[in-house]
């Protein structure tokens, strides 16, 4: 009747204990078995599980691309860009506050419960789009508290992959995100045009429910049981899971600080671009729904190639830091092109460059993961996701304000190509926010130059021992892993032959 969490002296104690007291280990063991049964899922943790979770969640939201533009314009006919930035801004700020906390708690209680929670609350606003637009936008803002699926997913992947495999694994997860956006906007636009927005919302809701069921039934827990406490009743103090305490180490470790500044300066314009770009294509460039869908599909397909085929080759030949620098260079180029471009062909050309810039995030995630110990991956990825959440709050508001200053407003839902729009398209800088974003990314590039190429350290752990102080000592890394290059062998088929404990079953 002993459990794994009992000490060697416990059998002797049970021999002299009363029957009532001796029943306590049985209850604790049965409770632990019951709580762990739903964590098992199918097979060993793999990139397959992470990829399906990401795909379903963002596929559901991708279906709503066209209906969301309609509801946004109908709800806020005046200053649409500005209100869009405000809504996304509140969501991003809440994500910034919650991401380190959720990442730290997932290091203690496991990844699966928080995967379930983040997906559920992130997708909760979907059916509200047809019920009440005001409630829909309100819940989108509040859902930012749990909109940190990527941080939990990357920590999930880090639990079962070796250090030199993670950049490839992160690339596949990010590519799955791009793949979910290849077809879903087109499907959503087709259903909306032929059957109405209500059917699109229904399909998106069903896909979100399918994702939740997949996590419940199929996704196995990736965090080793000996790292987790014996039960959910374990005492977790606020100090152990304080998001601000976990953020304090950013200033104490120079490498982590440089990485975080790089992420902030590079993702700030990217977040603003994501929040307003489809509206910009309609209002300023004159793209219709079909062209927007085709544009998303093209960029998505090219992003998949960039984050799978090219990323592994670049990491092997250039190294982690230089791959990040290359991605930032592509981002500067595409933002400048969007800023000066006023014709449709320029948008298509800049989209190919934008796809190549998508290698930055998985490369940065691999870089921060190398500075975190095995039991601190959730905290490490939570910091990055928290900073991205802050950018999701500031970026859309910044872009919306710049559009407002330059009198770019969504006066009509469809493409507007009349004489009122000609002066803007003929202006020297048709897209001022994008050019401003290129300047910010240039600053990020300069900061990234000072990131060390490789430094093995307990960076995240040594300043965050309070998160795992009550847990058992994590398994030590082997010395061979400490000296091996970043991506010894990134062939995705060979990675799938690893032992179950360190398996990286690629897509």
UniProtKB/Swiss-Prot annotation:
Sorted UniProt keywords: Glycoprotein, Membrane, Transmembrane, Transmembrane helix, Transport
Glycosylation (residues): 464
Gene Ontology terms: cellular component: membrane
GO molecular function: transmembrane transporter activity
Extent of Polar residues compositional bias: 462-473
Extracellular membrane side: 1-51, 106-113, 158-170, 220-257, 305-323, 369-389, 452-507
Membrane topology type: Multi-pass membrane protein
Subcellular location(s) per record: Membrane
SUPFAM superfamilies per UniProt: MFS general substrate transporter
Matches recorded under PROSITE patterns: MFS (PS50850), SUGAR_TRANSPORT_1 (PS00216)
UniProt-listed Pfam families: MFS_1
Residues in the Cytoplasmic compartment per record: 73-84, 135-136, 192-198, 279-283, 345-347, 411-430
TM helices/strands, residue ranges: 52-72, 85-105, 114-134, 137-157, 171-191, 199-219, 258-278, 284-304, 324-344, 348-368, 390-410, 431-451
Chain segments carrying region Disordered: 1-22, 462-483
Protein family (similarity comment): Belongs to the major facilitator superfamily.
Name of the protein this chain belongs to: Hippocampus abundant transcript-like protein 1
Organism field: Rattus norvegicus
Gene designation: Mfsd14b
């Amino acid at each position: 009747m002993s459990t794994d969490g009992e000490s060697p002296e416990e059998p002797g104690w049970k021999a002299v204990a009363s029957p009532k007291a001796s029943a306590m280990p049985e209850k604790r063991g049965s409770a632990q078995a019951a709580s762990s049964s739903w964590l098992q899922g199918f097979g060993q943790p793999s990139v397959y599980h992470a990829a399906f979770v990401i795909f379903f969640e963002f596929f559901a939201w991708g279906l709503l691309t066209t209906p969301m533009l309609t509801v946004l314009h109908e709800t806020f006919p005046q200053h649409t860009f500005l209100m869009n930035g405000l809504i996304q801004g509140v969501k991003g700020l809440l994500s910034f506050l919650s991401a380190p906390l959720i990442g730290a708690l997932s290091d203690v209680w496991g990844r699966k419960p928080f995967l379930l929670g983040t997906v559920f609350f992130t997708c909760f606003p979907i059916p509200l789009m047809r019920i009440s637009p005001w409630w829909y936008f309100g819940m989108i803002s509040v859902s930012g508290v749990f909109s940190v699926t990527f941080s939990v997913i990357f920590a999930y992947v880090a639990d079962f992959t070796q250090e030199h495999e993670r950049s490839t694994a992160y690339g596949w997860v990010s590519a799955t995100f791009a793949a979910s956006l290849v077809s879903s906007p087109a499907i959503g636009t087709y259903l909306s045009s032929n059957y109405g927005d209500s059917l699109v919302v229904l399909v998106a809701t069903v896909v979100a429910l399918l994702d939740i069921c997949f996590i419940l039934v199929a996704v196995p827990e990736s965090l080793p049981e000996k790292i987790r406490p014996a039960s959910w009743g374990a005492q977790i103090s606020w100090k152990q899971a304080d998001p601000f305490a976990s953020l304090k180490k950013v200033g104490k470790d120079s490498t982590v600080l440089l990485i975080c500044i790089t992420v902030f300066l590079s993702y700030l314009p990217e977040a603003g671009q994501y929040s307003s770009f489809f509206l910009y294509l309609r209002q300023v460039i004159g793209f219709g729904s079909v062209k927007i869908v085709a544009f998303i599909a093209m960029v998505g397909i090219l992003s998949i190639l960039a984050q799978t085929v090219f990323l592994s080759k670049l990491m092997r030949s250039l190294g982690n830091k230089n791959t990040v620098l290359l991605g930032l260079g592509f981002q500067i180029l595409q933002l400048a092109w969007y800023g000066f471009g006023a014709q449709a062909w320029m948008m298509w050309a800049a989209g190919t460059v934008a796809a190549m810039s998508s290698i930055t995030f998985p490369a940065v995630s691999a870089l921060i993961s190398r500075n975190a110990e095995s039991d601190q991956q959730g905290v490490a990825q939570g910091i990055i996701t928290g900073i991205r959440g802050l950018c999701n709050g500031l970026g859309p508001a910044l872009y919306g304000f710049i559009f407002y200053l330059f009198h770019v407003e969504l006066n009509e839902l469809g493409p507007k190509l009349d004489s009122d729009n000609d002066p803007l398209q003929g202006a020297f800088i048709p897209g001022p926010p994008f050019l401003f974003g290129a300047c910010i990314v240039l600053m990020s590039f300069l900061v990234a130059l000072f990131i060390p190429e490789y430094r093995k350290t307990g960076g995240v752990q040594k300043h965050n021992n309070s998160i795992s102080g009550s847990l058992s000592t994590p398994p030590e890394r082997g010395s061979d892993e400490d000296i091996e290059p970043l991506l010894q062998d990134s062939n995705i088929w060979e990675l799938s032959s690893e032992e179950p404990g360190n398996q990286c079953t690629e897509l």
